[in-house]
Curated annotation (Swiss-Prot):
It comes from Gibberella zeae (strain ATCC MYA-4620 / CBS 123657 / FGSC 9075 / NRRL 31084 / PH-1). InterPro entries: Enhancer_polycomb, Enhancer_polycomb-like_N. Its main location: nucleus. This is Enhancer of polycomb-like protein 1. The lineage of its organism: Eukaryota, Fungi, Dikarya, Ascomycota, Pezizomycotina. One of its GO terms (cellular component) is NuA4 histone acetyltransferase complex. Pfam families: EPL1.
Length: 590
């Protein structure tokens, strides 16, 4: 027999279950449900028929040897009859119910139009006992409704009608509280009530809340109250548990803070109470003292009878330590007679030593480089730059202008390009004002001034490099106006600035390949073809210098290198002598 592996779904309120009697159950199906193979073993299907496992399962269902240890009942020594009185009365603090006056003393059933017509028809032929009033009719109908709701609560489902005998206890109680004989009119009213209930589907005549009775019919009924809903089980996760724990911790912390605040407020009020009692006692004693002074005729100041404003305490000044005079001061000295300051190393001395070592290292490398190139002729221009004392400086210089009161002399017209221009005349210098305003630092204004540099290029061509020149404005045409179509004028984002060394080899090579702007050729006359051809012919005639000129240039270069080496050697010797003198002076001081 194969085991049943059907997963049973969870029951809910909408699941339809058949109700079967004992004789309607199939014996084979019942045996399949109660067989041992249907027990959840927790192992694989192929191993469920294992001998030892089946033996354990059979013994688990038939063995009665195992007993659950349960503590035996013990008689209590507490006598509740002596501790608690027998007549128990509920305290008035319990909440019982809250109803209106009409709900307590009047009838809850209200007559309808059909009830009014029936009552008029019934009173048209009154019995010997008299007519039936409207209040008595409502009381009788209320007894019928309450009894039917209590005895047959599911009358609307199984169509059960409460018999007249069930109404007699309620009618008897009503007959005792009403002055008229209600039982004489109860039977005709019961028949009328029964017909009305059957017309309404055996539902209560009195308006009440409509509850859910059938899943399919009442699912879309808007008047149904308190629908049954399947409670979906929430999945617990670790994050949810942590959140609940944090919430509980926060709640406990807040409650503890509130408790501490209450305790502190209580202590504050108790201190205020003590202060008020002390103030009152002081006031009473002062009043008594004043009466005693008046009685004894003592005249004097009444400062003790008035609360004086406390004076501010002066801050305690720290004690001043007197230093001894200069005659008694002695500078601490060592055992060998030197002062302690002699062992201190100054930062300037350390920096000077590092700079000296660095310069000596550079000079040593320069000398080694010259030794390596001693038997070689280097035709490059300035192969090894000499060491400068003031650091490397850019060979740019500012263009200085001056006013000439007279026509220029022959010396000014014959001035060399590399000569330093004379200082400006006093006419250019402005008088210093008392109040001055500068838009920026002097470095910025200095950088904005134009500067020029002269250099000789290939084939002995003279080049003039300019810096700080004003760029002419660009003219926007139709072909360039669309370039700024999608640009934003927002000042929030500043354009990136890329720091580039203008004298870098790659930067110079890139600038050499940039085509010239068209505005540079604007307004210039056209060059005739004859001049272009003559310039090309002249350039073609230029050749490299002759071997004699190259040899003369190499000789001059070697002579310059030897002079520079002698100069560096003299400087190194002078520095070495200075260092030796310093060491000798230090040794004499020791």
């Amino acid at each position: 027999m194969s085991s049943r592996k059907v997963r049973v779904k969870k029951l809910n309120v909408k699941t339809t279950l058949p109700v079967l009697r004992e004789d309607q159950i199939d014996p084979n199906e019942y045996e399949a449900l109660t067989t041992d193979n249907q027990i959840a073993t927790g192992v694989e299907q192929a191993e469920e028929n294992e001998y030892h496992l089946q033996t354990i399962l059979k013994e688990a269902g038939t063995s009665n040897d195992q007993e659950i240890p349960v503590p035996p009942p013990q008689e209590s020594d507490i006598n509740y009859d002596d501790l608690y009185p027998v007549p128990f009365h509920k305290p008035s603090s319990y909440i019982r119910f809250s109803q209106t006056v009409e709900e307590c003393i009047t009838c809850l059933y209200d007559m309808t139009t059909e009830d009014d017509e029936f009552l008029k028809q019934y009173n048209s032929k009154p019995p010997a006992t008299g007519v039936l009033s409207e209040d008595d009719f409502e009381h009788i109908m209320e007894v019928f409704e309450d009894t039917a709701a209590e005895q047959t609560p599911f009358a609307a489902v199984d169509n059960t009608v409460a018999a007249y005998d069930m109404m007699l206890p309620g009618l008897t109680h009503l007959n005792q509280s009403v002055s008229t004989d209600v039982l004489q009119h109860a039977k005709p009213v019961y028949e009328y009530w029964k017909s009305r209930r059957q017309e309404a589907g055996n539902k209560p005549l009195h308006p009440s809340l409509k509850f859910e009775t059938h899943q399919e019919t009442d699912d879309t009924d808007p008047f149904v109250c308190f629908r049954r809903r399947e409670a979906r089980q929430t999945r617990k996760t670790r994050a949810r548990d942590n959140k609940i724990a944090e919430t509980l911790k926060k709640l406990r912390r807040e409650l503890e803070d509130g408790r501490q605040l209450v305790l502190l407020a209580y202590e504050r009020e108790m201190v205020k109470r003590e202060v008020m009692s002390m103030d009152r006692a002081i006031f009473e004693e002062r009043a008594r003292l004043k009466d005693m002074k008046l009685r004894l005729g003592i005249k004097g100041e009444d400062e003790d009878l008035v609360n004086q404003k406390p004076q501010k305490r002066k801050p305690v000044e720290p004690p001043v330590v007197r230093q001894p005079t200069g005659a008694h001061l002695r500078q601490p000295v060592r055992s060998d007679g030197r002062t302690l300051d002699a062992d201190l190393v100054l930062l300037s001395d350390k920096l000077a030593e590092k700079e000296t070592e660095l310069r000596l290292d550079i000079e040593m490398k320069v000398q080694n480089h010259r030794k390596w190139n001693q038997n070689h002729i280097d035709l490059t221009r300035e192969p090894l730059s000499p060491v400068k004392e003031q650091g490397t400086e850019v060979k740019f210089r500012q263009a200085k202008t001056q006013y000439l009161m007279t026509p220029p002399a022959s010396t000014s017209s014959e001035m060399e390009v590399d000569e330093i221009a004379p200082d400006a005349m006093q006419l250019d210098k402005r008088e210093s004002s008392v109040f001055q305003f500068t838009a920026g630092s002097g470095e910025q204004s200095k950088g904005s001034q134009p500067a020029f540099r002269r250099r000789i290029g290939r084939l002995n061509r003279l080049w003039i490099d300019r810096r700080g020149m004003v760029t002419p404005p660009r003219e926007l045409g139709e072909d360039r106006s669309d370039r700024w179509k999608y640009d934003s004028d927002s000042d929030d984002e500043e354009p990136p600035v890329y720091e580039v060394d203008p004298f870098d080899t790659r930067a110079l090579k890139f600038r050499a390949t940039i085509p010239l702007n068209p505005y540079m050729f604007r307004g210039r006359p056209a060059v005739p073809p004859e001049a272009v051809a003559a310039a090309q012919a002249q350039a073609g005639n230029r050749v490299l210098p002759s071997p004699a000129a190259a040899a003369a240039h190499a000789h001059a270069q070697a002579h310059a290198q030897a002079a520079a080496a002698a100069h560096l050697a003299a400087q190194a010797q002078a520095k070495a002598q200075a260092v030796a003198q310093q060491q000798a002076q230090a040794a004499q001081g020791v």
